[in-house]
């Protein structure tokens, strides 16, 4: 081994878990022409949202009696509008086969990911001597993350395990993420995603709602929908009821 070579047992990579906010595009029917037109309308309303946005194509709600979808064509339409397909979610055999043919990862249908696993039964072992139960672990409480400076376009701020408070304004193209609630005391013009690990009780509080997108536990509204709300530009709170986002005055 030359003096400049690194020993082979020195690790050159690490595998790390990560939580990313990924948009899911759920198709209700196989109609790529209509999809192209409707995506173009969405892009016109919130262009910053459709800028190299990672995407999962959800095909598991397509009717079983509809023909096979043109998956490469669907991906081209998404790419044309700034959406970068990472994987599909599918249950129909023809959709899964089409994804495998182009080396695109296939995720299980939405319900399958939430189904509890049933462990294999194990052979009965001799019962050990009883031991006193361990003291319950103290729950990990993460402090609220507070940002006192303006959040500029292109910035992404994440409050892991807690709430996020921004005392200034949030510019277009900026992104706020929190496992808990999000509070913005300035103008909210970027994207706010609360409860991103599935907390349906999370809320978003804004003193001036002019956001590109708001989302709670994966349910979202984009600028086009928000502008039609009579509380656009006002102080509001956003909450989730079932799969419906509710916007009410503060």
From Swiss-Prot:
Assembly and oligomerization: Interacts with MinD and FtsZ.
Family, as annotated: Belongs to the MinC family.
One Pfam family cited in the UniProt record for this chain: MinC_N
Function: Cell division inhibitor that blocks the formation of polar Z ring septums. Rapidly oscillates between the poles of the cell to destabilize FtsZ filaments that have formed before they mature into polar Z rings. Prevents FtsZ polymerization.
Organism taxonomic ancestry: Bacteria, Pseudomonadati, Pseudomonadota, Gammaproteobacteria, Pseudomonadales
HAMAP family per UniProt: MinC (MF_00267)
Species this chain originates from: Pseudomonas entomophila (strain L48)
Superkingdom, taxonomy of origin: Bacteria
One GO BP: cell morphogenesis
Keyword terms: Cell cycle, Cell division, Septation
Protein name: Probable septum site-determining protein MinC
Regions of compositional bias (Basic and acidic residues) in chain numbering: 112-128
Gene3D superfamilies hit by this protein: 2.160.20.70, 3.30.70.260
NCBIfam families according to UniProt: minC
Sequence segments annotated as region (Disordered): 109-142
């Amino acid at each position: 081994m030359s003096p400049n070579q690194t020993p082979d047992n020195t690790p050159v990579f690490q595998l790390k878990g990560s939580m990313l906010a990924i948009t899911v595009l759920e198709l209700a029917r196989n109609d790529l022409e209509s999809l192209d037109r409707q995506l173009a309308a969405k892009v016109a309303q919130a262009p910053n949202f459709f800028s190299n946005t990672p995407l999962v194509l959800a095909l598991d709600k397509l009717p079983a009696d509809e023909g096979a979808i043109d998956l490469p064509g669907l991906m081209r339409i998404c790419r044309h509008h700034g959406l970068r397909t990472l994987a599909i979610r599918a249950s129909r055999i023809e959709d899964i086969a089409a994804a495998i043919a182009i080396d695109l990862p296939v995720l299980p249908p939405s319900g399958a990911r939430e189904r509890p696993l049933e462990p294999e039964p194990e052979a009965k072992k001799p019962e050990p001597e009883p031991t006193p139960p361990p003291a319950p672990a103290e729950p990990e409480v993460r402090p609220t993350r507070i940002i006192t400076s303006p959040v500029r376009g292109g910035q992404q701020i994440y409050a892991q395990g807690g709430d996020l408070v921004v005392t200034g304004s949030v510019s277009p193209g900026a992104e706020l993420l929190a496992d808990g609630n999000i509070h913005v005391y300035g103008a909210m013009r970027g994207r706010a995603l609360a409860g991103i690990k599935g907390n349906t009780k999370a809320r978003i509080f804004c003193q001036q709602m002019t956001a590109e997108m708001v989302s709670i536990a994966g349910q979202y509204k984009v600028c086009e929908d928000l502008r039609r709300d009579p509380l656009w530009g006002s102080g509001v709170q956003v909450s989730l009821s079932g799969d419906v986002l509710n916007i009410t005055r503060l």
